[in-house]
A protein has these predicted regions:
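Phosphate-coordination/substrate-recognition cap region in phosphate-metabolizing enzymes
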Residues: 61-64, 72-73
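A short, histidine- and acid-enriched strand-loop-helix "catalytic/donor-clamping" loop
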Residues: 72-76, 145
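Active-site regions of metal-assisted phosphoester/phosphodiester hydrolases
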Residues: 1-43, 49-55, 64-67, 81-229
């Protein structure tokens, strides 16, 4: 199926645990939902997501929108963390719990897979969805503050995506936490700062869009359109 002509709009955004700069002092789910609703995308790759947000985001967005998530770190006693994070998000920060999430709009998810990339110093995960076209789209948040570790995470993710795709086109995006990154056999489709999109078997069409998110998050969303390569 993946041989058919296709167009896929991919967005990657680190949500900074649902916080803003300056601090809002309250839950910002409505604002993040509105921002995502206002942008064009087929697949949104999200990092540092409050674990209770993916389903709520999918429900708030015009769709249909499907969500898939994988928990990352600081999720013990999650109901307690959630109660504190909803009330004081800027005080508890990342201790509210963490997840990566993929939202898919207007397309069904045929399969979802996850693989742990490392345990230490924090659990890092790769997650990916297979679309009905056969294209795989992967999402990761690499280790922060350690360039060799971040590159290791990215390489493990690349190898895994090659295995999962089995020759089909695929996309790998997210917060790589390292600059100047290249991945063997993959095309750099676009990015900003440490937030990148790579592709295999697909090519970018048009410009890389760094989207205006106002005060939300400390990362800018990046969107690219991919077509048959």
């Amino acid at each position: 199926m993946y041989g058919a002509a296709m167009r896929l709009r991919v967005l990657t955004w680190n949500l900074w645990h649902g916080r803003s700069d300056p601090a809002a002092g309250r839950d910002l789910l409505p604002e993040f939902s509105a921002a995502l609703q206002g942008w064009e995308w087929d697949v949104a790759l999200l990092q540092e997501v409050p674990p209770w947000w993916p389903g709520a985001l999918a429900q708030r967005l015009q769709g249909p929108v499907e969500d898939r998530q994988v928990l990352t770190s600081r999720n013990a006693l999650l109901p307690v963390r959630r109660a504190l994070a909803v009330r004081w998000p800027d005080l508890i920060k990342s201790n509210g719990g963490g997840a990566n999430a993929i939202l898919v709009r207007g397309i069904s998810v045929a399969e979802h897979r996850t693989r742990r990339l490392c345990w230490w110093p924090e659990r890092r995960q790769l997650q990916a969805v297979r679309l009905p076209t056969g294209v795989w789209v992967g999402n990761l948040h690499a280790t922060v503050g350690d360039d060799p570790a971040a590159r290791r995470d990215a390489e493990r993710a690349r190898v895994t995506m090659v295995q999962w795709a089995g020759g089909a086109p695929f996309v790998l995006g997210g917060d790589f936490n390292v600059r100047g990154l290249s991945l063997a056999g993959l095309t750099f489709a676009g990015g900003y700062d440490v937030d990148f999109v790579f592709a295999s078997g697909l090519a970018r069409a048009g410009d890389v869009d760094v989207l205006d998110r106002g005060p939300l998050s400390d990362h800018a969303p990046v969107a690219v359109t991919l077509v048959d390569g």
